[in-house]
């Protein structure tokens, strides 16, 4: 067989294989977007009662691959803003005098393995635990013109150290959270989710020396999701997992 003919046969073979396997893999893919809010927790004493003052808009996009009827793997990109202001809290006199506030963009790329323990009708809860990389760049403000007035010399010195601090503006983070999806039909789903991120940085807020502690900072993303399922859909009306697991209506438990 001539080389040109052989090349054509090989190309046709791989094209045929690609056409045959694409629906098998495509039916397990989901793409979506999130809209919601981002929230910070760290050296400024954000509390549940006052957290509403600190929530800022966030959004993201994700791609999720459903390995089987109980386990999936999601890659997600999020963007939001972290904000806190000590005037909202007043937990101690010296912090009120310090009058610190900060704002920082937060960008995240996360890999999120997730478990879907069961489906109840058209609703399906899930939990996730993963690994993320985040970047941030805090802008800070103290009481002006003299933020250290009437403060102890030691506190004044620590505030000066924080102002002059040199630190990395990237960090690894461990996302942990959960949510629920509602399957509108076999192509679309809407949902809600919330997750916290434990970071390995104490500088999301650019406070470290004057914090009075050594714990690293946290941030949170939460909101509503809208997603679309490729190929065979999400199985709302039948089997979609590609592994024999039925994720149709009713209560469905994991099959191993």
Q: Where are these predicted regions, by residue range?
A:
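Extracellular loop and loop/strand-boundary signature of outer-membrane beta-barrel proteins
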Residues: 43-49, 94-101, 161-166, 208-213
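Short glycine/proline- and aromatic-enriched beta-strand/turn motifs that initiate or cap beta-hairpins
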Residues: 25-66, 227, 231, 255-256
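Predominantly the C-terminal beta-signal and adjacent terminal strand-loop region
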Residues: 185-256
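Outer-membrane beta-barrel proteins
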Residues: 22, 39, 67-69, 114-119, ...
């Amino acid at each position: 067989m001539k080389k040109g003919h052989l090349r054509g046969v090989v190309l046709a073979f791989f094209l045929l294989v690609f056409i045959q396997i694409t629906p098998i893999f495509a039916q397990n893919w989901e793409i979506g977007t999130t809209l919601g809010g981002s929230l910070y927790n760290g050296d400024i004493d954000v509390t549940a009662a006052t957290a509403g003052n600190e929530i800022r808009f966030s959004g993201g996009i994700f791609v999720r691959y459903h390995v089987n009827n109980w386990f999936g793997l999601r890659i997600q990109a999020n963007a939001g803003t972290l904000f806190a202001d000590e005037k909202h809290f007043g937990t101690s006199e010296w912090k009120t005098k310090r009058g610190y506030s900060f704002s920082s963009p937060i960008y995240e790329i996360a890999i999120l393995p997730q478990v879907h323990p069961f489906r109840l009708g058209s609703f399906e809860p899930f939990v996730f635990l993963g690994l993320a990389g985040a970047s941030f760049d805090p802008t800070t403000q103290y009481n002006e013109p003299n933020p250290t007035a009437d403060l102890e010399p030691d506190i004044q010195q620590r505030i000066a150290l924080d102002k002059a601090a040199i630190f990395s503006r990237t960090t690894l983070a461990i996302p942990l959270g959960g949510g629920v999806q509602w399957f509108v039909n076999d192509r679309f789903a809407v949902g809600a989710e919330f997750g916290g991120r434990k970071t390995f940085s104490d500088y999301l807020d650019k406070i470290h020396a004057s914090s009075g502690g050594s714990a690293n900072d946290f941030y949170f993303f939460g909101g509503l999701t809208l997603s679309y399922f490729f190929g065979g859909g999400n199985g709302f009306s039948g089997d979609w997992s590609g592994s024999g697991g039925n994720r149709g209506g009713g209560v469905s438990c994991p099959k191993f």
